[in-house]
């Protein structure tokens, strides 16, 4: 129910100054009743996505093509309900400004920013959805992670792929590059890759989360 605060515990967008978690704030709280939940923000997401059901997996902040900040949300699933959906690789976002109280204020409507189709790439053998995106400030590029969890016969098949593109190509809507091994083979994660972090100029950290099998 997009008019209810019942899902606040599962659908918060929070912000706090680095190293000061005691100053946490809810982003875009509902102004109608003063409840500290992100109902207003969820309604903006639903309007941008255009579907009653969606799953957000990925959050990044990048410089916009206008010189200010652009906050990005990765969409993994969208459809009518949790059991009637399609996997997508879609990114929506909006430019923002910081308020005097160190919160985020959107200065434009949330809208489609980027999308791509892994099925167009040789070596991608599974339908997958977006599971993470992360900005690399050292090299001005964006990493995207897609993952899959399916069955072939009676056997469960899980894994993921890593993609990269420059910030300029991202703003231009160009296709990402599929990351490969040095010998040209597609890099396919052996577990369900669900998160990525840029540690420094040369290292990435990938998080696995196998929903159906917790044995790594």
Predicted regions and their residues:
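Sequence/structural signature of beta-propeller domains
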Residues: 1-216
């Amino acid at each position: 129910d997009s008019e209810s605060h019942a899902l606040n515990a599962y659908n918060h967008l929070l912000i706090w100054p680095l190293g000061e978690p005691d100053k946490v704030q809810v982003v875009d709280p509902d102004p109608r009743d003063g409840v500290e939940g992100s109902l207003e923000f969820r309604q903006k997401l639903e309007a941008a996505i255009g579907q009653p059901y969606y799953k957000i997996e990925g959050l990044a902040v990048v410089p916009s093509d206008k010189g200010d900040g652009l906050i990005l949300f990765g969409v993994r699933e969208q459809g009518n309900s949790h059991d009637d959906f399609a996997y997508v690789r879609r990114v929506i976002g909006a430019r923002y400004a910081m308020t005097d109280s160190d919160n985020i204020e959107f200065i434009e409507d949330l809208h489609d920013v980027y999308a791509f189709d892994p099925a167009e790439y040789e070596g991608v053998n599974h339908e997958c959805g977006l599971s993470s995106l992360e900005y690399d400030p050292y090299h001005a590029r964006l990493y995207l992670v897609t993952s899959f969890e399916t069955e072939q016969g009676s056997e469960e098949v899980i894994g993921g792929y890593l993609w990269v593109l420059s910030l300029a190509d991202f703003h231009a809507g160009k296709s990402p590059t599929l990351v490969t091994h040095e010998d040209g083979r597609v890099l396919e994660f052996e577990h369900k890759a669900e998160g990525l972090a840029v540690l420094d100029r040369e290292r990435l950290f990938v998080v696995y989360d196998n929903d159906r099998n917790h044995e790594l």
